[in-house]
Amino acid sequence: GIMDTIKDTAKTVAVGLLNKLKCKITGC
């Protein structure tokens, strides 16, 4: 349902942000 879609979207955004942080800290 909608909640699942929201959860999936939030997860994707969170992963993207974590990857950006990782790139800043350790390089890509």
Swiss-Prot record:
GO terms for biological process: defense response to Gram-negative bacterium; defense response to Gram-positive bacterium; histamine secretion by mast cell; positive regulation of mast cell degranulation. It is found in: Secreted. This is Ranatuerin-2SEc. It comes from Lithobates sevosus. Expressed by the skin glands. It comes from the Eukaryota. GO terms for cellular component: extracellular region. Disulfide bonds join 23-28. Keywords: Amphibian defense peptide, Antibiotic, Antimicrobial, Disulfide bond, Inflammatory response, Mast cell degranulation, Secreted. Mast cell degranulating peptide. Causes histamine release from rat peritoneal mast cells in vitro. Has antibacterial activity against the Gram-negative bacterium E.coli K12 and Gram-positive bacterium M.luteus NCT C2665. InterPro entries: Antimicrobial_frog_2. Belongs to the frog skin active peptide (FSAP) family. Ranatuerin subfamily. Its main location: secreted. It holds the Pfam family Antimicrobial_2.
